[in-house]
């Protein structure tokens, strides 16, 4: 199964649909509001799980379908949004890696609007202020949340790209006031291998 089909299956076909009263509903997508203070998104599952995945499917009907893995019980949610709606300004207490499975996806990071295209990735450090921009153009985004406990494992792996190494070292050293992100555009010949790895990782989280 392709990564796109797997993400669609997770976010759009799970039978258990949670209501907007569920705390995970607002964690997945908090709309922009008049609140001045940024939201701090905490790690949503047990810290014993070093990694989680969040699948977003944005459709032309101005609805976001989403699901979190691992989750017990499994669920999905359907969230309406007006075109070009922004989420609430927020940070995370974990690293976030976003991969654009299909379509395009825009974020406002540190006050700058950046559009990511199919096959591109964005790695956002903790405490980096950003907003997600929801558009009615069809797109699928796969987010991975990386817990602090996983930093050592990442740092011990063989990472060829020096910028990634520097970024992770900075995060690992807990320079909490340093706000940063990285935008990656993999070569076309590397995309199939990368998607195969992400697919396998997602399958492991689904269990």
Role assignments for model-derived ranges:
Residues 93-95, 128-130, 140-142:
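Generic beta-strand structural signal
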Residues 2-21, 25, 36-46, 50-78, ...:
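A hydrophobic/aromatic-rich effector-binding and dimerization subdomain
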Residues 110-126, 136:
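Short acidic-glycine-tyrosine-enriched beta hairpin
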Residues 6, 93-94, 101, 117-118, ...:
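Short, well-ordered loop/turn elements at secondary-structure boundaries
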Residues 67, 78, 85-92, 108, ...:
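Short histidine-centered beta-strand/loop micro-motifs
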Residues 90-107, 146:
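Short, conserved beta-strand element in jelly-roll/cupin
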Residues 104-106, 122, 126-132, 150-152:
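Histidine-centered metal-chelating micro-motifs
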